[in-house]
Amino acid sequence: MSRQQQFKNREEKILATAEQLLLEAGSGDITLDSLADQLDLAKGTLYKHFSSKDELYLRIIIRYEEQLFNINKIDDSVSAGVSRMILQQLMSPQKALLFNQIEERLAASAQGLNRMFGELYEIRRARMKRLIDLTSGYLQSQNSGLSTRDYLSTIWAIGQGGASLLNSSFYQRYLGRRDTLRVALVQQMLDLPKQYPSVDEEDDDMVDLVNQIDSESEAHIQSQDTSS
């Protein structure tokens, strides 16, 4: 195995272990000392991969976003794709909520992470385009007049709200089984388009959303060219 591959493998192990420690802590923060101890590495070795703890956190979030993107790229049926969109949050509610909290904190206070945030947003925009294709395709298959924008927003709202419920030990005392709640929420989202019969109008929202994403991507590329 080459030294480059060894370095890459070690970095992946660092990210996976740091993610697990974050989830176990539940507070959105860990110490590099505890991470180094868990990995049986010198603390200085961590700095060969990440210049700061904030950079480590953001790299974990980028890795998570890449995993979501790869799941959304599965090409089977649009209904299965829509179901996966919701389940991504409902199956790992703690991770979805915690990583969003960490990202918001980094965006508000961290310094020197503009390039990495640009990388994160590019991956997210690519995933957004895939989600738009899935939701638009499902709406068409259901002959629905619901707009892509409204359907996406509802899916995210239900996913985020459902994740909050599933992550709450207090509300879980009253909500019963987690698996039946997940099934109910997914089924609600699959049934929603049928409540909006088609009026034979084109879904301009889909085109607008794609154009907006493309414009943001072009602006990001131009800003990178200017800064370099």
Identify the role of each PLM range.
Residues 1-25, 29-38, 55:
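Basic, helix-initiating cap at the start of DNA-binding domains
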